[in-house]
Amino acid sequence: MDLDQIVADAQQSFEQAADITTLENEKARFLGKSGALTELLKGLGKLDPEARKTEGARINVAKQQVEAALTARRQALADALLNQRLTAEAIDVTLPGRGAGAGSLHPVMRTWERVEQIFGSIGFDVADGPEIETDWYNFTSLNSPENHPARSMQDTFYVEGKDADGRQLLLRTHTSPMQVRYARMNRPPIKVIAPGRTYRVDSDATHSPMFNQVEGLWIDENISFADLKGVYTDFLKKFFERDDILVRFRPSYFPFTEPSAEIDMMFEQGKNAGKWLEISGSGQVHPTVIRNMGLDPERYIGFAFGSGLERLTMLRYGVQDLRLFFENDLRFLRQFA
């Protein structure tokens, strides 16, 4: 076969190859083990030395031309593939940005901050304290000594470790221990709320093993039950932002207050109109508790109350199931953004 024709055929075949696979197949026709140029090189041994030298030089020139055409086509296919990819992945920098999603407060945290703001506006401090408590602060200081029947009212999470008296540490079952700690470090008048996480062995649509609570304490020389009623009623009206709220105090029992009362509220309008809704426990601080705070119960008196932050949130927003606050379902949480 004429060398010029072989080179021309190779160049045409390479140029018509639409992809790398086809190009490699065409390469084998001319440069493979049985390719046209390879066969010519094999036949050089049959020629005399002078003719072998001349013909070998011509074949090598043709081979170089074929390899150059092959390299050029490979590069052209690679460039085309790159351009195709760049086009597919192109970014229009003139398009508006997507922006980062805006976060928002959890509904219970909204309630937490709202409670702090309302009580802060009338002079209450905010106390903080450990969630892992000692037996004395969680029970004994609050008039629930060992074997007191009131302890059976709460199923408690006990944890590894013991306090200085050798008693098992526990997860606090209410935030009252923070009030005792605060009172032992401050002098009357004492006005403080203690919001925080608490733990009890309980879980259903209206109870959770971990929940948030806020407790309030006011101790001074001339505090009465009327002050408790006025402060808490005013809080409810500010929290729910409405004046059509009726409040009643039902006699009850708590070991740390005497007398004690459950606080119920009722809206005069809206879907809950006419329904008494339990909202808080309260009472005048028991003399034993005042004594455990390092104060003289003959001189000082006070009131205390405790409310669940989830309970307040459920009533404010009309949420029926407490567990929704802990499931992290964005469809639910976005309603409060």
From Swiss-Prot:
Belongs to the class-II aminoacyl-tRNA synthetase family. Phe-tRNA synthetase alpha subunit type 1 subfamily. One of its GO terms (molecular function) is magnesium ion binding. It comes from Burkholderia cenocepacia (strain ATCC BAA-245 / DSM 16553 / LMG 16656 / NCTC 13227 / J2315 / CF5610) (Burkholderia cepacia (strain J2315)). The gene is pheS. This is Phenylalanine--tRNA ligase alpha subunit. Its cofactor is Mg(2+). It is found in: Cytoplasm. One of its GO terms (cellular component) is cytoplasm. It holds the Pfam family Phe_tRNA-synt_N. GO terms for biological process: phenylalanyl-tRNA aminoacylation. Keywords: Aminoacyl-tRNA synthetase, ATP-binding, Cytoplasm, Ligase, Magnesium, Metal-binding, Nucleotide-binding, Protein biosynthesis. InterPro entries: aa-tRNA-synth_II (IPR006195), aa-tRNA-synth_II/BPL/LPL (IPR045864), Phe-tRNA-synth_IIc_asu (IPR004529), Phe-tRNA_ligase_II_N (IPR004188), Phe_tRNA_ligase_alpha1_bac (IPR022911), Phenylalanyl-tRNA_Synthase (IPR002319), tRNA-bd_arm (IPR010978). PANTHER family: PHENYLALANINE--TRNA LIGASE, MITOCHONDRIAL, PHENYLALANYL-TRNA SYNTHETASE. NCBIfam families: pheS. Gene3D superfamilies: Bira Bifunctional Protein, Domain 2 (3.30.930.10). Tetramer of two alpha and two beta subunits. Coiled coil: none annotated. Its EC number is 6.1.1.20.
